[in-house]
Amino acid sequence: MELQQKTKTDTNGLIPPYGGELKNLIIKDKNLKNDLISKATYEFECSERNACDVELLMVGAFSPLEGFMDENNYNSVIKNNRNTNGLLFGLPIVFDSNNEKVKAGETILLTYKKQKIALLEVSSKWEPEKSLEAKLCYGTNSLDHPAVKMIFNERGRFYIGGRVYGFELPILSLIHI
């Protein structure tokens, strides 16, 4: 009895990316990049964690996402482990901030160590119920759990969702052990 399941492949012999399409969000056109930068309403310096997530979005590692999850997708993921399109996502992909002024419809130039890495078109901003997120995603609210500790102690007050346009990959430091 053969138990091996055949997987659909593309013409190159590779399995298709999750969600069916690899999302490369890096803008190569310098004029378009400069135009997007000039339209930024705000400039935010990313934490290392946010910069890592921006990089993962830019290179398609979070495909089929084209940016940070909006409030509807966030709620769907923490409650159902699926985005609003029904695709499995175990954890929400969010950008956090303490900025009270930014609102939907505005754009944020994302920098990391002064490097212009991306533009975020804000489609959604909300104040998450972090205790619910911790409980549903990690099964606990205990700060002994490193991810719960990160949610409560490192993430900003607000989550911001929206489309990301990548400019250049952030130059990240090595993880300290």
Give names to the regions the model predicted.
Residues 140, 144, 148-155, 159-173:
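Catalytic P-loop NTP-binding/switch module of NTPases
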Residues 126-140:
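Short, solvent-exposed secondary-structure boundary/capping segments
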Residues 2-4:
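Non-catalytic accessory regions outside enzyme or core folds
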Residues 175-177:
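Conserved small/polar residues in nucleotide/adenosyl-binding loops
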Residues 6-8, 12-101:
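Accessory interdomain/linker segments of ATP-dependent helicases and helicase-like nucleic-acid enzymes
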Residues 118-126:
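Short beta-strand-centered aromatic/proline hotspots
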Residues 94, 109, 121:
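Short, conserved beta-strand segments within well-ordered enzyme catalytic domains
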Residues 105-113:
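Short conserved beta-strand and strand-loop elements enriched in small hydrophobics
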